[in-house]
UniProtKB/Swiss-Prot annotation:
This is Glucose-6-phosphate isomerase. Gene3D superfamilies: 1.10.1390.10, Glucose-6-phosphate isomerase like protein, domain 1. Pathway: Carbohydrate biosynthesis; gluconeogenesis; Carbohydrate degradation; glycolysis; D-glyceraldehyde 3-phosphate and glycerone phosphate from D-glucose: step 2/4. PROSITE patterns: P_GLUCOSE_ISOMERASE_1, P_GLUCOSE_ISOMERASE_2, P_GLUCOSE_ISOMERASE_3. InterPro entries: G6P_Isomerase (IPR001672), G6P_Isomerase_C (IPR023096), Phosphoglucose_isomerase_CS (IPR018189), SIS_dom_sf (IPR046348), SIS_PGI_1 (IPR035476), SIS_PGI_2 (IPR035482). It comes from Salmonella paratyphi C (strain RKS4594).
Amino acid sequence: MKNINPTQTSAWQALQKHYDEMKDVTIAELFANDSDRFAKFSATFDDLMLVDFSKNRITEETLAKLQDLAKETDLAGAIKSMFSGEKINRTEDRAVLHVALRNRSNTPIIVDGKDVMPEVNAVLEKMKTFSQAIISGQWKGYTGKAITDVVNIGIGGSDLGPFMVTEALRPYKNHLNMHFVSNVDGTHIAEVLKKVNPETTLFLVASKTFTTQETMTNAHSARDWFLKTAGDEKHVAKHFAALSTNAKAVGEFGIDTANMFEFWDWVGGRYSLWSAIGLSIILSVGFDNFVELLSGAHAMDKHFSTTPAEKNLPILLALIGIWYNNFFGAETEAILPYDQYMHRFAAYFQQGNMESNGKYVDRNGNAVDYQTGPIIWGEPGTNGQHAFYQLIHQGTKMVPCDFIAPAITHNPLSDHHQKLLSNFFAQTEALAFGKSREVVEQEYRDQGKDPAQLEHVVPFKVFEGNRPTNSILLREITPFSLGALIALYEHKIFTQGVILNIFTFDQWGVELGKQLANRILPELGDDKAISSHDSSTNGLINRYKAWRA
């Protein structure tokens, strides 16, 4: 992978000039000047997904110049490097191969001279056998009862991905009740333990090293709770499984290492739902549906790695994002799924994007002088319309939005879905085209009112429009289409990281806080006043000690 400062390319300079020409052009003008705009600025994927990027402040010239930027930063070479197993995560000397986990073609993928696919398939087969025993009731707890509840204990990538997918695929779930515990706040696990029975509960402890502070604190609390009823430590083996690579620590915890499911250092946490970390997904929706999830992602992997850049959906979305972030000064992107099952999708890609591309040091080790990763946020529609859409429509900040919706709902109650989708379509139209003063005044006339008498209200009812959006319309949310959608966003993030010359697959920014927390923890063990930090931290710790007493 080449290390190229994007701002030093001729394409970046051309884009800066182009921005000066485009900054006052409106989306309404772009549509008025081109009756075929939708056809030119939209594309389908496998007849399962339509991506409409026509309601953006872009022209064919804009996209051509952005594609030039991708060429000058050698995006094509970087894609080949990732898929071929090159160690593109250079700060940790690791390959980046979540694509191998869903490589349904079984084409060899080589890391350090070794094909990883046999090991990937072996773990998949092991998960299949284990999950079938749990789901069928063949696996019994220590009193001979079948498992009814599964508690996944993890944090970050070991929690966000499985939680998001199991929620998104709820229509496919079986009889097992799924619970997720992540926060080290004891309230989280305490509330989950109130809902489950130790005789019929399986705990999945998801920690690659089996040393993650939050996860192991929760795991030990779960173990203590379990043993209060079960008594004999040998029963732990029937109620705990590990998603880890540390066999020694897993065995010491009391888990049978036969029920330890491995993954590899080339699997990043926030890209790990496709690995053994996805065992909770399998237990929720069954192995066949998990394979469909993998297959959907693999189909998008093929699209990303083989489709020309001009028609490549992850690349197009990535380039449009860079256009707004670096030239228009937009600092955030909203992800707005119009599907209640997808209520954790924005939170998942908040981590996916911000932990990947929230970096200020480039691949040469130098501080950047341009924008890198955006702030990602969002909530399901239509809830967001009654919360923060006011700012998106009439605020002073540009917030590019991705609207996501299925054409077919899993719950066709009366006309609920038509009403939901009418809002989905209306919002992007309103954001793009707005409402002029003239239209507001005419509406008053149509109501028999004199606009002159309402002059004090008219300005507040004007919508400037020109707010950019992408619309992603799925035929239906299935395991396959969800897998493709997740992979679409993963590759968008990777593309932006390549072009912006940052390392997308490390996360050193999470380390300092953990180091300081480990230093502070022993200081909280007594009631002595603390003076070893800055005055603010000392003051906070000392007030905490005074109040807890």
